[in-house]
Design a protein with these regions (language model features):
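Carboxylate- and glycine-rich phosphate/diphosphate-binding segment that chelates Mg2+/Mn2+
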Residues: 145-255
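Short, intrinsically disordered, charge-balanced linker/junction segments flanking boundaries
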Residues: 2, 156-160, 266-269
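C-terminal catalytic subdomain
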Residues: 254-269
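Buried hydrophobic packing segments
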Residues: 75, 98-103, 193-194, 218-221, ...
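Glycine/threonine-rich beta-strand-loop-alpha-helix active-site module
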Residues: 70-172
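ATP/NTP phosphate-donor binding region
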Residues: 1-86
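Short, well-ordered alpha-helices that flank and scaffold nucleotide-derived cofactor binding pockets
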Residues: 19, 48, 77, 104, ...
Length: 269
């Protein structure tokens, strides 16, 4: 599974974003992380495009790395209070993951954490969403899984949320990231690939062949980007690698083993 519509670009995807904004609902929750979105000017552009289309915009900022369950509930309250009919997530994996669960929680009369971990039931209705990706590596826009930290329970666990109806992946939007964060994202992509690759069955199959190609490309393009941070092609390839690692293509015919991620979740909680 993957977003219904995906737009890949090496330069700013303004036209694609505007086309998608023409299709969305009237009341929009604009979700993002810290101040960098405003500092780069992207926030003002998106606000302007939404207002040009007569949309009512509600801010949902301050989504932290490793988003908390409290932040999810804050977003759900905003959606209910302002009758939000579309969630626009702008950011990296944390923003994108948080909104997946917000989208699901709003449609439920019960606590989504208890629903999934006590009753082992999963949501089936969601508020529509779109994503503008500003950091590659997590591939979060490609699936409906989210990792949320429950501070009260001291747990960091996966939750099932919504799929995005569209995703804008433009490598130009990652140019403002520190190189250290770009490198970390590439290693996250490698970890996704490896944890799929090492999973059963360990027999020859096409998924493994594609996986090997993606891993080779991550290593090659990351080296190129470190040597030349202005290499837009290498930057775009890393974003494409990130998407391929998490859009389920590499998981076909595999019993994935994400124990390295699970160990990190336990430590990170």
């Amino acid at each position: 599974r993957y977003p219904v519509r995906q737009h890949f670009f090496f330069f700013f995807a303004e036209n694609a974003i505007k086309e998608e904004l023409d299709r969305i609902g009237q009341n929009v929750l604009l979700a993002y992380g810290g101040s960098s979105l405003k500092r780069t000017g992207l926030y003002d552009k998106i606000i302007s495009w939404l207002h040009e289309r007569g949309k009512n915009v509600v801010d949902f900022g301050g989504i932290m790395p490793n988003p908390t369950y409290d932040k999810v509930q804050e977003g759900a309250r905003l959606v209910r209070e302002y009758n939000i009919d579309f969630i626009l997530a702008v950011g990296g994996g944390s923003v994108i993951d948080c909104c997946k669960v917000v989208s699901a929680q709003v449609k439920l009369d019960e606590d989504i954490w208890e629903m999934q971990y006590t009753k082992h039931q999963y949501p089936t209705e969601f508020v529509p969403m779109g994503a503008i990706v500003t950091a590659s590596g997590t591939g979060a826009e490609q699936n409906n899984g989210a990792v949320i930290t429950h501070t009260e329970k001291k747990l960091k666990q996966p939750l099932t949320g919504a799929y995005y109806s569209f995703a804008i992946l433009d490598s130009d939007l990652t140019r403002t990231l520190p190189m250290g964060q770009v490198v970390s994202g590439a290693f996250d992509t490698l970890s996704h690939c490896m944890e799929i690759y090492m999973g059963k069955p360990q027999t020859d199959n096409l998924s493994d062949e594609i996986n090997e190609a993606v891993m080779r490309n991550v290593i090659k393009k990351l080296r190129e980007l470190i040597a030349d941070p202005d290499n837009d092609f290498a930057r775009g390839e890393l974003m494409w690698d990130s998407a391929l690692a998490e859009n389920s293509l590499l998981k076909l015919g595999k019993q994935t083993d994400f124990q390295c991620h699970m160990l990190e979740h336990a430590v990170g909680a």
